[in-house]
Regions:
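Catalytic cores of nucleic-acid endonucleases
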Residues: 49, 53-113
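Hydrophobic transmembrane alpha-helix bundles
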Residues: 1, 66-82, 126-140
Length: 144
């Protein structure tokens, strides 16, 4: 591996958003907005429409061996789902994993170098939902 500049956490996040953006376009979603600087605890990173469905997309990106995880907690999860519901939208989670393709070991594959190719892991979308009995705010959230 060469000594190249590294991607920042924001660069990695933006790359994950770009990956999901391109996939949604392939799947016939019309992207209405994409915002790498959206507050991850309260705002979606992308809003899109397909047929009659408006959807908010929460996107997280991680470097090998990990993947993007929702780590903001239950309160943020519920806030994001409620925010989508208030706008008549569905809410989806997209987890993206990146591995430096120049790497041959786990350590090398975890280095987010600029200007290299990456192996991408994206298994699709997971709908973020709250159980029907969350009116009292005590029920746990569900990802289906």
């Amino acid at each position: 591996m060469q000594d190249r500049p590294l991607m920042s956490a924001r660069d990695i996040h933006a790359f994950g958003i770009e990956i999901v953006y391109k996939q949604l376009e392939k799947d016939s979603w019309a992207i209405e907005s994409a915002d790498v600087d959206a507050d991850i605890k309260s705002e979606p990173q992308m809003i899109a429409r397909k047929d009659d469905e408006l959807a908010f997309f929460v996107i997280r990106t991680g470097m090998h061996p990990g993947r993007g995880r929702f780590e903001e907690g239950q309160e943020a999860f519920e806030r994001l789902v409620h925010h989508a519901q208030q706008h008549g939208a569905s809410c989806y989670f997209a987890s993206v994993g990146l591995a430096n393709s120049d790497g041959t070991t786990d350590d090398e594959m975890s280095v987010p170098e600029k200007g290299v190719a990456f192996n991408i892991v994206f298994d699709g979308l997971v709908k973020m939902e709250l159980p029907a009995n969350t009116a009292n705010g005590n029920a746990p959230a569900a990802v289906s």
